[in-house]
Amino acid sequence: MDEVLRALKYRAWHRGTREADMMIGGFFDAHHAAWGAHERALFAALLTETDVDIMAWAIGTQPVPERYEGPMMDALRKLDFIKVAK
């Protein structure tokens, strides 16, 4: 993993709440391998937003800003990457 991805991973997994870590960090782990430069930049921008906003966009309780609409947000909204204890 290159330096940029390591930094994104750290930022994704150290958000401030366990719930945000699981959602945003889990999303990173599930999807980062397929990202090019554009997706990396978009994810880096997304990480500058508050956890409350990101989580609200992901679960659909707030509208997603136009700048984040697209395949990455569609994948985040699926929430199929979060490990749930059984």
Where do the language-model regions lie?
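Positively charged, polar, low-complexity stretches
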Residues: 2-86
